[in-house]
Every structure is written in C-alpha cells, then in structure tokens.
C-alpha cells in the first residue's frame, strides 16, 4: 500500500456520530415511498488520495499506474492508507446505517455492484478489528452450498458464505434477504474501518453468489414501491439522500433529462453525448460511462481529463502519486457532461478532492482511464440529482436544488 516520509500510520477507528439516520418519511405500506438520509460521522482517519484512486481503478478492473499499485499494495508501517491527524483536523464521512438481524452496520450504497456483503463474526479476529460485525450464527439461516467471492488482479478481495436474514434500511425491512457474510477479506478491505460492507444497487443478474445468484435488497423491495425507482441526491461536504419509489421535485431544478441504460453487464451504464471544460464545448464527443455511487472519483477518457487539466496553471500528471494534481490555491474551472440538451455542471470546488499531506499539492477528483466504459463517481454525483429507473431501464439527470 502507500508510504510517505511525512505521516504516521493510524489504524484505530476513533469516530463519533453527529447526525442520526432519518426514518422513512411516510409509511411504505400506504404510500410506496420512503427516504434514506446518509449519516455523518467524524473520524480521525484521512484517506491518502492515491489509495482512493486505487480503490476505484481496482473495482472496475482497470490497469493500475505503477505508482498507484506501489502505493496501494506496499505493506509496511503505513500499510493502512491513513494518516494521523489532530482532533481539529478530522474528516467527515457519509455512510448508510443498516440493521441485519440484531446487528447495526455502516455500509456504502453502491450502484456499481450487486452484492450485499458485510464483515461478519466468521472472519478472523484481526480482520474484525474496529469494524461493526454481523453475527449470522445468531439470527441467520445458512444457504447450503452457496458461496461468493470478489477478487481483483492484484490479489485483494473478499469471500464468504451466504445467509438469509432480515435486513432493514431506514426502517424498511426485507424479512428474508440474502446476506453475503465475509469469512475472508484482504488487509486492504480490513483497513477501511469507516464502513463494514456494501449494499449493491446494481442489477440482480450481476450478483456474485454462486451457484445461484441472489436478489439485491432493492430487487426484493421493488414491488412494494409506488414506482420501481430510486434517486440519489448526494451532497458536497454534507449528508445526502436516497429516495425510493418516487421523485422528490423539491430536490432538483427543471425537468430531468433521460438516457436509456444498457444493463447487459449489470451496471447503470449509458452513453453521454459531449462534455465541456471551462468555456470549451465538445458536443460531438460521445462516451460510455457507468454511474457509480460507490466510487469516489470520476474516471474519464484521457482526452477529457487532458483537456480539462490543460486549463489549470500548475497542473500535472504526478507520476509519484499516480494521478492529476495541481496547486491547492488554484481556483478550478467548471466541468460539464452533456446529457441530451442538459449540461450537468460540476463546480470546480468539487474537483478539488484532497490535499496530499505535507504538501501544497491537491489531488483531482477527475482522473484518467484508457478503456471504456468511463466511471462517473462522487465528484460528479454531488452536484446532480440522479434517477435510477428500472422501467426501461433508464436514468434521469437534473441539477440539484
């Protein structure tokens, strides 16, 4: 994993909570709709930017630049990818609280996967350290001969058994949900102590359980909703919202612009018809991209990233850190993606992702990939209201109100 002369590893999770989780805004039984508000936690963990890039590239099976691979896979005194900070320098993280059986865990809602996997009591004790744990032996029913595995080319991953158990998100319970209980995780997963697993909102046929694929949590509640949709209204430096079964028109401006979804690979994938960097429009550049709430960065074609960073004085592709960087005191230009006639504008401040510790250099929230499809992650989503509609399927986009 990563290493640097100017930080000390800090593995202990020292978070505290500052916002309670919102319960459903209405009774699902009578309205077919409900809302989840992300939970804000303050933690003394600070992610190293190249490590976060490594996570996104690895998840989407993209080639790793040598520097990113070296930083992410080096196992040494700084192997956990965190830096020590003082109490006044804590980070804020936004997570989603879920109850499985009698256990409460923090998970990522992830449109880029269809697996519902969590840290469990079946892991070795060292892998459970600083995580909230699911205890399937207390409330779950094991699915015989059903297993799962997530693996990447660099040797990282997770694997385990499958149990049926009740799973409740924002008070809405699925009484018999397939939960993928980890029996093994690589140390890179174990070191991510802010969350305890993933609840995938991709398509059911992308689920990784074998020999019989299992329904996602959303797949199990979809028929109980007013409409087969969920929306994401994620925020920059604030808790965001997921709405289920309806479109909250108070959260967006204007009419959403829709694109058809190609779900053949299980992703929320579509084709965009252009982009803008600063005042430069490129309305004929079409590219495919996956919309992924579980990835921090937006991983875009090299032609787009090079054009964007060419507008920023002092920007460079930093080979030591494996990505595009720039002076932290720089005011970044806007970036936009064209969706039919709608330009989805990303403010420059959303692209200034993080300062590299010990320097005056910041790491960009837009980074390059050479292979299609691209990935639109948090740096894009935190300015947009996005509709994920299983009727079609299709996605709608509008500016946040």
Curated annotation (Swiss-Prot):
<feature type="active site">
    <location>
        <position position="292"/>
    </location>
</feature>
<dbReference type="GO" id="GO:0005576">
    <property type="term" value="C:extracellular region"/>
</dbReference>
<dbReference type="Pfam" id="PF00026">
    <property type="entry name" value="Asp"/>
</dbReference>
<keyword id="KW-0064">Aspartyl protease</keyword>
<dbReference type="InterPro" id="IPR034163">
    <property type="entry name" value="Aspergillopepsin-like_cat_dom"/>
</dbReference>
<feature type="glycosylation site" description="N-linked (GlcNAc...) asparagine">
    <location>
        <position position="282"/>
    </location>
</feature>
<feature type="domain" description="Peptidase A1">
    <location>
        <begin position="94"/>
        <end position="398"/>
    </location>
</feature>
<dbReference type="InterPro" id="IPR001461">
    <property type="entry name" value="Aspartic_peptidase_A1"/>
</dbReference>
<dbReference type="InterPro" id="IPR021109">
    <property type="entry name" value="Peptidase_aspartic_dom_sf"/>
</dbReference>
<keyword id="KW-0964">Secreted</keyword>
<dbReference type="InterPro" id="IPR033121">
    <property type="entry name" value="PEPTIDASE_A1"/>
</dbReference>
<feature type="glycosylation site" description="N-linked (GlcNAc...) asparagine">
    <location>
        <position position="102"/>
    </location>
</feature>
<feature type="glycosylation site" description="N-linked (GlcNAc...) asparagine">
    <location>
        <position position="80"/>
    </location>
</feature>
<protein>
    <recommendedName>
        <fullName>Probable aspartic-type endopeptidase TRV_05382</fullName>
        <ecNumber>3.4.23.-</ecNumber>
    </recommendedName>
</protein>
<comment type="similarity">
    <text>Belongs to the peptidase A1 family.</text>
</comment>
<keyword id="KW-0645">Protease</keyword>
<keyword id="KW-0378">Hydrolase</keyword>
<feature type="signal peptide">
    <location>
        <begin position="1"/>
        <end position="22"/>
    </location>
</feature>
<feature type="active site">
    <location>
        <position position="110"/>
    </location>
</feature>
<comment type="function">
    <text>Probable aspartic-type endopeptidase which contributes to virulence.</text>
</comment>
<keyword id="KW-0843">Virulence</keyword>
<keyword id="KW-0325">Glycoprotein</keyword>
<keyword id="KW-0732">Signal</keyword>
<dbReference type="GO" id="GO:0004190">
    <property type="term" value="F:aspartic-type endopeptidase activity"/>
</dbReference>
<dbReference type="InterPro" id="IPR001969">
    <property type="entry name" value="Aspartic_peptidase_AS"/>
</dbReference>
<feature type="glycosylation site" description="N-linked (GlcNAc...) asparagine">
    <location>
        <position position="329"/>
    </location>
</feature>
<dbReference type="GO" id="GO:0006508">
    <property type="term" value="P:proteolysis"/>
</dbReference>
């Amino acid at each position: 994993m990563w290493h640097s002369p100017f930080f000390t590893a800090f593995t202990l999770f020292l978070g505290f909570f500052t916002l309670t989780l919102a319960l459903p805004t209405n009774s699902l039984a009578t309205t077919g709709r409900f809302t989840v508000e992300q939970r804000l936690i303050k933690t003394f963990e600070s992610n190293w930017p190249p490590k976060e890039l490594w996570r996104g590239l690895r998840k989407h099976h993209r080639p790793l630049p040598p520097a990113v691979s070296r930083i992410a896979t080096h196992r040494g005194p700084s192997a956990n990818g965190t830096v020590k900070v003082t109490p006044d320098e804590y980070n804020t993280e936004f997570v989603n609280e879920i109850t499985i059986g009698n256990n409460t865990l923090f998970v990522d809602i992830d449109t880029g996967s269809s697996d519902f996997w969590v840290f469990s009591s079946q892991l070795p004790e060292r892998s459970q350290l600083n995580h909230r744990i699911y205890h399937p032996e207390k409330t779950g029913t094991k699915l015989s001969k059903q297993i799962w595995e997530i693996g990447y080319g660099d040797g990282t991953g997770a694997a385990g058994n499958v149990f049926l158990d009740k799973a409740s998100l924002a008070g809405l319970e699925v009484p018999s949900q397939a939960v993928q209980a980890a029996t093994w995780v690589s140390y890179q997963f174990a070191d991510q102590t802010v969350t305890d697993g993933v609840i995938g909102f991709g398509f059911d046929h992308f689920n990784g359980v074998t020999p019989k694929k299992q329904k996602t949590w959303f797949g199990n509640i979809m028929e109980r909703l007013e409409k087969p949709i969920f929306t994401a209204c994620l925020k920059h430096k604030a808790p965001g919202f997921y709405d289920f079964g309806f479109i909250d028109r108070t959260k967006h401006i204007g009419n959403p612009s829709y694109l058809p979804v190609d779900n053949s690979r299980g992703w929320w994938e579509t084709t965009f018809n252009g982009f803008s960097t600063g005042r430069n429009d490129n309305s004929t550049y079409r590219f495919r991209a996956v919309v992924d709430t579980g990835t921090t960065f937006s991983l875009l074609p090299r032609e787009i990233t090079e054009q964007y960073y060419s507008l920023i004085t002092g920007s460079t592709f930093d080979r030591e850190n494996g990505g595009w960087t720039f002076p932290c005191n720089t005011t970044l230009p806007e970036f936009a993606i064209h969706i039919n006639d709608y330009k989805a504008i990303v403010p420059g401040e959303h692209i200034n992702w993080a300062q590299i510790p010990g320097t005056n250099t910041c790491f960009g929230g837009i980074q390059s990939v050479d292979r299609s499809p691209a990935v639109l992650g948090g740096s894009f989503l935190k300015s947009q209201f996005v509709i994920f509609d299983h009727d079609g399927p299709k996605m709608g986009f509008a500016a946040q109100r």
